[in-house]
Structures are given as structure tokens and as C-alpha cells.
Amino acid sequence: HPFQGQSPYSATKIGADRIAESYFRSFELPVTIVRPFNTYGPRQSTDFVMSKFIHAALNDKDITIYGDGSQTRTFCFIDDNIEACTNAFYQNKFVNDVVNIGSDIEITILELAQKIISICKSKSKIVHLPPLKEGDMTRRKPDATKMRELLVHDLTPLDTGIKYLVEHYIKRKKLTEAE
């Protein structure tokens, strides 16, 4: 897809890609550009949708969604991200190339909230807020073909990753309370 720096954040990512490419062209330094998409896992900040929803559900608090929740995302478990990035470095399979690090299995934000509430057996309610301003991405889905070539196993299924994360947060909460 064409690069469109719609925000300072996305513009810096495009700039970093261009700098890496220039090192290859100028100094013949081999590079592999990895582009992570919605990685989640233990110790992730609650500023991100996955951990934010799980923390809310575990505490039976409302889960807020912008708009109708039809915007889609894909989620990549941290272990898959690490394995793909490490193998990209050691295998030299995609030198001077770009590898999207993420799942290509889409889920709507509403479905994600419902799934998390179900897995957590939560009493949380879903609250809809006005949609974000125009320009917010309604769909993010990477082509994960190259990433799949770097993994020795299938991507972690979303339900498996969420269940692992829920167990992690529960254990961590118990440890914190025991101190």
C-alpha cells in the first residue's frame, strides 16, 4: 500500500524505513525492515486496546469502544513477534526487504471486546463513545506471508493468547496483593 504519513507517528515510521533503506544503498549494509502490527502480551501498557479491555473485564468495569466497533484490527502475540524478528535476523531470508510482523486474521473491536468479556467471565458492559475523528484507520491488516515463513509453528490463535494474558494478569495481581 502507498505510504501516507497521516500523523507524526506514522510519518516517523516511514522516515525510519527510508533511513534504513539509505544505509543499504549508500554503504551496502544489509537491512531487513520489520513492521510490527498490534503486538500484545504480558507487561504491555494498559494504553493499548488488548490490555485495556482485559484489565477492564477482569475488574467488571465498562469497556469503551469508539463508534460502532466495526473497525478491524489484527493481533500478534509477543512470542510470535520475537520468533519472527529473531529468525529474520539469523536466517537472512529477507535481506533488503520488508517483513510485516503481525497476524492477518481480522477481528472487529466490538468482537474483541465481546470475546474478552466471555473469556474473563466478566460482568463488564460495552459502552459506545462517539467515533474518533476522520482519518482514524478503520482497518489494519498486514500481509503476513513473509512472517509465516519465519515461524516454525502457526501463529498463536487469538483465544489462546488472550487466555494466556488473562492468566498472567490474574497471577500478577495475586502476587502483588500477597506482598
Task: Give the predicted meaning of each segment.
Residues S7, A11, Q44, F48, ...:
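Residue-level signal for the nucleotide or nucleotide-sugar donor/cofactor binding architecture
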Residues A57, C85-F89, A113-I116, A144, ...:
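Hydrophobic "lid"/C-terminal helical patch
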Residues N81, C85, I101, L112, ...:
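Non-catalytic, hydrophobic alpha-helical segments
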